């Protein structure tokens, strides 16, 4: 059994890691950490795990964690993971970092996040559909939630060198703001409302740019605007991709199905994607339509921000890092409606 630890287990992504790992056939949950809740039952904050999990929060040092765990998931705030990674990797422990600390080139991270990086090392960007090489790695940077939905929507056309301009419009559920309420996630402000924010300068844009330009080096005109909607889970992305040549919807079907051949978590529903059809699952549902008059392609993608956008994707990476099938412990339908 793979002994797993979660650093920062009291938040939403930590709780989702616990939920998905508790029944994983190849994993034993070894520890869950929280500085402020050390000694208290994990189920005191994650009540949905009552009867499934008998663990107390701990606050061990990195050496103790490294000695007890085969894999560690870092579900900590941006700027904190870099304090753990050097010691955790000083041995045979594998690490999946769910923060932004290692997703970008160091100079880009410091510019976007305004944090001086104390451990500038490279990590594979853990979007398995683009980077299957995670299977050979001990350290993986798990992608952000918005970039996951956006990149997967555009990657086939970017890889074919067909995109001239990309415009991503994403709607996210409230859980994307984290466990502490903010003005945008406070119920009276968001109920029956939609709140756009960081219209031109959201920091997740840097990941989208990095990955799409990695597929097509000349693609530079990439735009991203997020909105919060009164839903608990999910990210729905509408990608307006202006192409260098006129494409038909049949062309798109061929390009997308070929690009995502043998990628089990990419689905092409018969209609448009919906958040309820992916909620609680690790799937990314994608549909597309060609606008020949304007050389535009509209691609829709739907993911659960806490699963494929965070914890499920982290476990998908872990599976490959340990030589397991990537679907292990994750092959389940959504919780619709």
Swiss-Prot record:
Catalysed transformations (reactions): N-acetyl-L-glutamate 5-semialdehyde + phosphate + NADP(+) = N-acetyl-L-glutamyl 5-phosphate + NADPH + H(+)
GO CC annotation terms, alphabetical: cytoplasm
Pathway given in the UniProt record: Amino-acid biosynthesis; L-arginine biosynthesis; N(2)-acetyl-L-ornithine from L-glutamate: step 3/4
Principal EC category: oxidoreductase
Gene Ontology biological-process annotations: L-arginine biosynthetic process
Origin: domain of life: Archaea
CDD domains: AGPR_1_C, AGPR_1_N
Pfam family, one: Semialdhyde_dhC_1
Keywords: Amino-acid biosynthesis, Arginine biosynthesis, Cytoplasm, NADP, Oxidoreductase
GO function term, MF aspect, one: NAD binding
PROSITE patterns cross-referenced by the UniProt entry: ARGC
PANTHER family: N-ACETYL-GAMMA-GLUTAMYL-PHOSPHATE REDUCTASE, CHLOROPLASTIC-RELATED, N-ACETYL-GAMMA-GLUTAMYL-PHOSPHATE REDUCTASE, CHLOROPLASTIC-RELATED-RELATED
Protein's job: Catalyzes the NADPH-dependent reduction of N-acetyl-5-glutamyl phosphate to yield N-acetyl-L-glutamate 5-semialdehyde.
Similarity section: Belongs to the NAGSA dehydrogenase family. Type 1 subfamily.
Protein name: N-acetyl-gamma-glutamyl-phosphate reductase
């Amino acid at each position: 059994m793979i002994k797993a630890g979660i650093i920062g287990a009291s938040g939403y992504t930590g709780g989702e890691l616990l939920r998905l790992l508790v029944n994983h056939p190849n994993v034993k949950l070894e520890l869950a950490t929280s500085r402020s809740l050390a000694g208290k039952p994990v189920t005191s904050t994650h009540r949905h795990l009552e009867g499934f999990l008998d663990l107390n929060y701990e606050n061990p040092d990195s050496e103790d964690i490294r000695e007890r765990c085969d894999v560690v998931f870092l579900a900590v705030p941006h700027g904190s993971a870099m304090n753990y990674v050097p010691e955790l990797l000083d041995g045979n422990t594998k690490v999946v970092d769910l923060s932004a600390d290692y997703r970008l080139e160091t100079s880009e991270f410091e510019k976007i996040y305004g944090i001086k990086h104390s451990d500038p090392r490279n990590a594979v960007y853990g979007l398995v559909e683009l980077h299957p090489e995670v299977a050979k790695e001990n350290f993986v940077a798990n992608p952000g939630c918005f970039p996951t939905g956006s990149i997967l929507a555009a990657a086939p056309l970017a890889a074919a060198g067909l995109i001239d301009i990309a415009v991503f419009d994403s709607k996210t559920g409230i859980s994307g703001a984290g466990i502490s309420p903010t003005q945008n996630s406070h119920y009276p402000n968001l109920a029956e409302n939609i709140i756009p924010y960081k219209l031109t300068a959201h920091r997740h844009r840097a990941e989208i740019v990095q990955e799409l330009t990695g597929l097509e080096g000349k693609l530079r005109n990439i735009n991203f605007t997020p909105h919060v909607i009164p839903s608990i889970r999910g990210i729905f992305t509408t990608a307006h991709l202006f192409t260098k040549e006129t494409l038909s919807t049949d062309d798109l079907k061929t390009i997308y199905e070929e690009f995502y051949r043998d990628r089990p978590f990419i689905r092409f529903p018969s209609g448009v994607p919906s958040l309820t059809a992916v909620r609680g699952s690790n799937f990314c549902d994608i549909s597309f339509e060609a606008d020949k008059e304007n050389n535009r392609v509209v691609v829709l993608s739907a993911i659960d921000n806490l699963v494929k956008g965070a914890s499920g994707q982290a476990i998908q990476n872990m599976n490959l890092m340990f030589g397991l099938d990537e679907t292990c412990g994750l092959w389940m339908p959504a919780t619709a409606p």
